[in-house]
Amino acid sequence: MTNQTVRGTKDFLFDEWYKFKHIEQTASRISNLYGFLPAQTPIFEYTEVFTKTLGDSSDIITKEMYSFNDKGGKSITLRPEFTAAIVRLLIEKKLQTPIKLFSTGPAFRYERPQKGRQRQFHQINFEVFGIEDPKADIELISLVQHLLTEFGINKNVKLEINSLGDGETITKYREALILYFTKYQNDLSEDSKNRLIKNPLRILDSKDEKDKSIISDAPKISNYYTKGSSDFFEQILNGLTILDIPYTVNNKLVRGLDYYCHTVFEFVTEDLGAQGAVFAGGRYDNLVSSVGGKHTPAIGFAGGIERIMELINYSPKEERPIYLIPIGREAEKHALTLANELRRNGLYVIYEYSGTLRTRMKKANQANAKAALIFGDEELSSKTLKIKNMNTGEEKIIARDNTIENIY
């Protein structure tokens, strides 16, 4: 037996777990302010839920999915992202739109582990269905900015945004890219050669050094916008300006999945090395209809909890315990009752079972207790307790019935 975590996974202990839960709980609280409803899906789905939605040229489909056949011979996949499963939920449950859904949990991709990238990772996920208005895009981006401010990292994380335009724009731009990249086909990386056939827009997302110089001179999508696409994008940029959200238009930003149209965006930082995206998302107006639902415009984004953890400074507020020190067998019989009473009044109690009084007082100091409650046969007979203020060393006798009122 190997007593270590699987490569690309990690344990969360103590303060690290408090930080994790702080991020999750903050996101949930902020989601309520924007009218999002909670939604949770299973961590695995039928494989076709993902293959039908993510596009056969995406790295997730071609390289990264954890898939297996169950005992009934069905192909099952651990979710690599949330949107496909949430779309499945929307269709299966016949949810009425417009609707905003918030979800959180683990996802799984077979990637090379590095800072900010694990094979099991956790996301906070926001999806808006049934709103075609660009104001939804603006509101969602402002929500990300709100989260960044809450986490105290808004100054180090910058918004990059692009528009892929409508269907007509994407078709024309696709043709232009095929024409351009075909001239350099022999110089492209193997991944980009494959993408040239399946989805040339994805070449723009390549991190391969062989591709970068070729990509730099590629046609710009803004030259192929229809008037509708151009107007839609302009409204979003104007809205961001009104909200004083700084941005950079990145013409090469396409995101890693094939279902996007119109708005795509990433909130990026240099503090995570190569894995610079903290939050990312975009619009996917045709995704729901492409998998059997009715036409439903949609936009969403996700943020990586582990990546946010790398960036934020968070220490849980230390809660100092009450240290319970019974002396003698009779006192020990009453100690559990007292501990239960204190805990049910919201107090953090450590009940020290054994040891000399000196040893237990030393442990109370080590635990940074705010008070010690000491009682033996004498206190039991007089229905009192001795309470010691661990800050000042002051001791006093209190009535057993007034314990809660006398806790420091």
Swiss-Prot record:
Its EC number is 6.1.1.21. It is found in: Cytoplasm. Keywords: Aminoacyl-tRNA synthetase, ATP-binding, Cytoplasm, Ligase, Nucleotide-binding, Protein biosynthesis. GO terms for biological process: histidyl-tRNA aminoacylation. It catalyses: tRNA(His) + L-histidine + ATP = L-histidyl-tRNA(His) + AMP + diphosphate + H(+). GO terms for cellular component: cytoplasm. Gene3D superfamilies: Anticodon-binding domain, Bira Bifunctional Protein, Domain 2. CDD domains: HisRS-like_core (cd00773). InterPro entries: aa-tRNA-synth_II, aa-tRNA-synth_II/BPL/LPL, Anticodon-bd, Anticodon-bd_dom_sf, His-tRNA-ligase, HisRS-like_core, HisRS/HisZ. GO terms for molecular function: ATP binding; histidine-tRNA ligase activity. Homodimer. Belongs to the class-II aminoacyl-tRNA synthetase family. PANTHER family: HISTIDINE--TRNA LIGASE, MITOCHONDRIAL-RELATED, HISTIDYL-TRNA SYNTHETASE. This is Histidine--tRNA ligase. The gene is hisS.
